[in-house]
Amino acid sequence: MKSEILCVGTEILLGDIVNTNSQFISKELANLGIEVYHQSVVGDNPQRLLDELKLGFERSDIIITTGGLGPTQDDLTKETGAKFFNRELVLDKKSLKELKEHFNRMGKSYSDGNNIKQAYFPKGSTIFPNPYGTAPGCAIEDKGKILIVLPGPPRETKPMFKNYVIPLLKKYSNGIIKSKTLRIYGLGESAMAERVSPFIENSTNPTVAPYAKEEDIILRITARAAEEKEALSLIEPVEIELRKILGVNVYGEDDVKMEEVLGRLLIDKGYTLSCAESCTGGLIASKLINYPGISKAFKEGVVAYSNEAKIKRLGVKKDTLDKYGAVSPEVAKEMAIGIAETSNTDIGISTTGIAGPDGGTPEKPIGLVYLGLYNRGEIKVKELRHAGTRDMIRKRATMNALDWIRRQIL
């Protein structure tokens, strides 16, 4: 069956909130083998919403909406759906009871006012309870068309979809679509695509497609099959070949992040780590402590931004700073050695650079970053040249640092 997603809310069109519901729903539908052909956003306008429903059902069998279920006057998704299917709105007493109980749990007094509209549904609807909010969802099935109406807040949308929508749609599922994602760092998108171009160009089931993210590149392998086991058997040989081609540049898979991969490596191999950051301003430490249990390996992080702090906290020599400047390989070395010695760790990583938007010179332009790496007595320095905003430069330097440590201890 063909499906599409229609998100309702002027706040999305204005860019006030990020629409994460479409991404979540698309992934879940793929797992059911239901293809998504269109995604749309419409403001809080009943006529435009009605127009979108008319257009959508001309080309799709299933439309899933999010948003527009609240108590205010501009929350009109159910009303518009009822109009489209020519059904009256009827009060569901169970939903009204649950609505009143929700208010009671929150310590608020209930009054019908606009609130009661959340307990009205198009006649004949399948109702989805909402224990995380006040607005239940519903589904309307009519002449082979299905309208699924969900609340807008993701904390309400996701559990409702998993608990009620998936069981409803499983009977319409024709197999599944399963994806496996390889996460890649250290290769540009074009260089990576060139290496794996035969898979991208010639594969049909599974298909292989690259996507550039802010911090890394992902390579998605997608298979269609009758069941998950069959899909995974199609994905596995392709994954093996891709890993052979890309080697150490593949650092993880699916939703695993670089800091999680590095954290596991450090703990499994018995390494301890400390970091001395200047231009990255604590981003390395912040990333590392995202991984639960990292205290077994990560001992200390110091943000030494000024020259005085580099001298006092890390033991960087004043003569080194005077001769080479703070942004130099020499200072990066002394920072890495200093933090490893003062923290008594196997590894010390340091960053010093010019993140901009000011401070660059022809000799030391904006985006120049030096990483220092002390690893059990061995010291190395890496020079990076990044483009972009201050934030982008700092994030890229952080990812480079984490990846460099990973490669050194593999």
UniProtKB/Swiss-Prot annotation:
UniProt feature coiled coil, ranges: none
Supply the HAMAP family for this chain. Answer: CinA_B
Report the source organism. Clostridium kluyveri (strain ATCC 8527 / DSM 555 / NBRC 12016 / NCIMB 10680 / K1)
The name this protein carries in UniProt is Putative competence-damage inducible protein
Could you tell me which InterPro entries the record lists for this protein?
A: CinA, CinA-like_C, CinA_C, CinA_KH, Competence-induced_CinA, MoaB/Mog-like_dom_sf, MoaB/Mog_dom
| Superkingdom as given in the UniProt entry | Bacteria
**CDD domains reported in the protein's UniProt record:** cinA (cd00885)
SUPFAM superfamilies in the record = CinA-like (SSF142433), Molybdenum cofactor biosynthesis proteins (SSF53218)
Q: Which family does it belong to?
A: Belongs to the CinA family.
Q: Which Pfam families match?
A: CinA, CinA_KH, MoCF_biosynth
